[in-house]
Swiss-Prot record:
Subunit structure: Interacts with SFPQ, NCOR2, SIN3A and HADC1. The interaction with NCOR2 increases in the absence of PITX3. Interacts with PER2.
Source organism: Bos taurus (Bovine)
Protein name: Nuclear receptor subfamily 4 group A member 2
Gene for this chain: NR4A2
Keyword S-adenosyl-L-methionine: no
Motif nuclear export sequence (NES2) per record, residues: 568-577
GO molecular function terms noted in the UniProt entry: DNA-binding transcription activator activity, RNA polymerase II-specific; DNA-binding transcription factor activity, RNA polymerase II-specific; nuclear glucocorticoid receptor binding; nuclear receptor activity; protein heterodimerization activity; RNA polymerase II cis-regulatory region sequence-specific DNA binding; zinc ion binding
Domain NR LBD: start-end pairs: 360-595
Amino acid sequence: MPCVQAQYGSSPQGASPASQSYSYHSSGEYSSDFLTPEFVKFSMDLTNTEITATTSLPSFSTFMDNYSTGYDVKPPCLYQMPLSGQQSSIKVEDIQMHNYQQHSHLPPQSEEMMPHSGSVYYKPSSPPTPTTPGFQVQHSPMWDDPGSLHNFHQNYVATTHMIEQRKTPVSRLSLFSFKQSPPGTPVSSCQMRFDGPLHVPMNPEPAGSHHVVDGQTFAVPNPIRKPASMGFPGLQIGHASQLLDTQVPSPPSRGSPSNEGLCAVCGDNAACQHYGVRTCEGCKGFFKRTVQKNAKYVCLANKNCPVDKRRRNRCQYCRFQKCLAVGMVKEVVRTDSLKGRRGRLPSKPKSPQEPSPPSPPVSLISALVRAHVDSNPAMTSLDYSRFQANPDYQMSGDDTQHIQQFYDLLTGSMEIIRGWAEKIPGFTDLPKADQDLLFESAFLELFVLRLAYRSNPVEGKLIFCNGVVLHRLQCVRGFGEWIDSIVEFSSNLQNMNIDISAFSCIAALAMVTERHGLKEPKRVEELQNKIVNCLKDHVTFNNGGLNRPNYLSKLLGKLPELRTLCTQGLQRIFYLKLEDLVPPPAIIDKLFLDTLPF
């Protein structure tokens, strides 16, 4: 094997790598005379071109100052940077060019163009120059044939023309791999392996990398640069190109939410779901307040008002209907006692105006309503067989018929009202004597109160407990002037728009009250207080009592009026007893004697 040895000569400070002196010993000698000024200009031009590196790898010449290099061919390489040692010789040995051709993308060459394998020793010049000496990257035919330098120059001219046309930077990694020399190596060195050139479009390359033009490679001298850190991890070329070419997605903007983040009611921004539907905070609060307050809205248009972010407050009726249309569930809204508390016991109310109604009055008022409904005739089963609206009816017939009709209506209502009283919670727990006393004392009051609530005073219809419907004029001869007071009371009572729950409480309070001769007045008073509290809670929370502060007082004020009407009824019975046209029934006679105030 022929041995080729090249030596660096000392060069002046600041000289370019292409102008270094070389000595070649084997079959011939080449001196620095071959490096003509045009080649020196070639190196200087490449050094000054606008070639920017897109990677942070150190220049190749930096490594060549401190390591011995051996060429070998392998697949795409890993970069392993050992710690630099002292300056040493660089050895290139045993290059198998046929193996190199198998892994490279260069076109095959003939054996005449292949250089002989051997060893080339590079020794640092003395004294060392501040510039990094140039190095021979590959064995090219130019060392065997002087004419190849001319071919190399032609390739460079073509390459320079292509570099000027295409300026788009492309990230490309070096085609060399480095590894630590095995132990026992006399000098601190690393192994360098040359991989096949990577065929990519020609663009400005990083300094010190290789350029491929028409299947041939050439080395670009690396300018003097500061040595970089040696602690790079392994990196594959394919992975690096994917990382550099992949565009990093920008983070989503907060100001432009997707359709999934819009309110289903008005289209405003919505962070999460409320009451089963993704809605904004405004529509959530509107829906909650409407359900908790049981608010009733009225649309001033055609009930199809647009509901969007700008016009959602114009029509509350259409906004609430749209909340229901998109699927918001009213049953999910928590009551006032659990407002704002998830899975925790309700605390004391924040203000005295918003107490929560206790559960026992709720069950009490339900029982009172049930008792009232069961003791009243259904509107579909009323008896109009004796109803006559003829004003001359009061002049016809005998007085005994009208008086007997009066007694029959009282006795028929007595059994129905007694059945109603027995369904009041707590009434049957009282002593029997107290039950009878309370019932007999309040019978006429209950008769008038229930009759006034059922009847229609505007049309003059009076509906009694047994379902019989009579005109007011049909009752004048039997009831006397008492019927006019009952109709007037009925008109005033219905003008108050009392609901069935409040009326059930008023009817119970008319009977459960303090009477003279009670055995256990304390128990009666306790039951009375329960009913009063139940009525108060109902009026406050469910009947708009907050907007009508005197409404409860007006309801309780009807009880003294009933006492006055009861006295008028006793006077009518007393007059009929004196007239003695029709003897009163025994139960009516007993009722009259037991309820006399004197």
